[in-house]
Amino acid sequence: MIVILLGPPGAGKGTQAQKIQKSHGLVQLSTGDMLRAAVAAGTEVGKKAKDFMEAGKLVTDEIVVGIIADRIEEDDCKQGFLLDGFPRTVAQAQALDNMLSQKNLKLDAVIEMKVDDEALVDRITGRYTCAKCNAGYHDLNLKPKVDGVCDQCGSMNFNRRADDNRETVSARLESYHSQTAPLLPYYKEKGVLKVVDGMADIDDVTAQINNVLSGFK
């Protein structure tokens, strides 16, 4: 089974990818991780990627797809894999399709975690953690029992990620949608696009995804 998971930053894509990996035996493939591994291993395509990176240039789609092609030949991918963060453009999607076709493989499902942008901004900007034990909290629905005091360790110091502000999050969402929007009709036309409610609670989203994937066992 070959699956692509689409979702904006903060939609919980990473959490769901881990759950899919565990429950369906799919290997989660991150293009960033694969690039670094290929460069470190000194593979032919890794050397090409290194040349681009050292020159301060973006690695080409051809090289990224080549790295994916090498990676999925490994034994742990024989039962299937989940692509996280790729493709981001129609050109990348087409290159991926061509590569899979050459290997007599096909994409089974593209799962879009659909979100409400304004609600997602609230979800992301409201989160914070204990500076001491890293326990997670939220302004809207997960405040400490005693205001300003961590439930877990009693610390009164909390941290927020610097990029968890409304302007930055909104810009990231806008970038995601501008890149990803053309992918949706592309995959819908191929009959592989499945949409789940990314604003539901974690377990409900997992159940929706499992329902989609159950048709491919």
Regions found by a protein language model. Give the residues of each.
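Glycine-rich phosphate-binding loop of ATP-dependent small-molecule kinases
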Residues: 1-217
